[in-house]
C-alpha cells in the first residue's frame, strides 16, 4: 500500500469516527402528551422533565423498559406513587432516586449509574421536573461509565438542559471519580 493510499484511508477513518461521535451526541426532541422536554439520545436512553402518570403507557409503547425518576416526592406536581404504579402496570421497571437539588448526594449518582447501565433497564427513560437533574446525571454517566471526554459530555448535557446550578456538582463528581 502506498503512503498516499494509507494516508487517505487513515483520514477517511478519522472522518468516519468524527461523524459517528457527532451523531452519538444528537438530541432528538419529541412532543409526547404528559411529558415536558422529551429528548431521545440514542436507542438506550431518553431524558425528560415532568412526566404525568398518564404518559407512562406511551413510553412503554415506545419500547422503554424502565423509568428512572429523579424527583423528590415532596416536589410540587410530583406523583411518585402514581407514577410507580403506572410504570409497573405498563410492564416496565420503576427506579425512584430522589435527587435533592439543594444538597445533591454523590451516593445517589452511584445508584443512578448502576440503574441506568443495568441491561434489563435498557432502554431507560430518565426524568426530573425540568430536565436539569437528568442532564447532570447523564453527563456524569457519560464520563465515568462510558469514558467520554468531559467536553463532549458537557456539550450533550447542555443540549439536554443542564443548568448552572447542577453543572458544578456534575463536574466535581466527575473530577473526584475519574482518573
Question: What feature does the model see in each segment?
Answer:
Residues 124-135:
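A phosphate-binding catalytic loop at a beta-strand-loop-alpha-helix junction
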Residues 13-22:
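Hydrophobic h-region of N-terminal signal peptides that target proteins for export
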Residues 12-13, 139:
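A periodicity- and composition-biased signal for non-globular, repetitive helical segments
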Residues 6-10:
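N-terminal export leaders
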Residues 1-4:
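N-terminal secretory signal peptides that target proteins for export/translocation
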Residues 22-124, 139-179:
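Cys-dependent protein tyrosine phosphatase-like superfamily
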Amino acid at each position: 500500500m502506498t503512503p498516499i493510499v494509507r494516508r487517505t484511508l487513515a483520514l477517511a477513518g478519522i472522518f468516519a469516527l468524527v461523524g459517528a461521535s457527532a451523531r452519538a451526541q444528537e438530541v432528538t426532541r419529541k412532543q409526547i402528551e404528559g411529558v415536558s422536554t422529551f429528548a431521545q439520545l440514542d436507542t438506550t436512553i431518553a431524558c425528560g422533565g415532568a412526566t404525568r402518570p398518564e404518559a407512562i403507557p406511551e413510553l412503554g409503547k415506545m419500547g422503554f423498559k424502565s423509568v428512572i425518576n429523579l424527583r423528590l416526592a415532596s416536589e410540587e406536581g410530583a406523583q411518585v406513587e402514581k407514577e410507580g404504579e403506572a410504570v409497573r402496570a405498563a410492564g416496565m421497571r420503576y427506579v425512584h432516586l430522589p435527587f435533592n437539588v439543594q444538597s445533591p448526594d454523590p451516593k445517589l449518582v452511584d445508584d443512578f449509574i448502576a440503574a441506568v447501565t443495568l441491561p434489563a433497564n435498557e432502554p431507560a427513560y430518565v426524568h426530573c421536573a425540568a430536565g436539569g437533574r437528568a442532564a447532570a446525571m447523564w453527563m456524569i454517566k457519560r464520563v465515568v461509565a462510558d469514558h467520554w471526554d468531559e467536553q463532549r459530555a458537557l456539550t450533550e448535557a447542555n443540549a439536554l438542559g443542564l443548568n448552572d446550578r447542577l453543572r458544578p456538582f456534575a463536574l466535581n463528581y466527575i473530577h473526584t471519580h475519574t482518573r
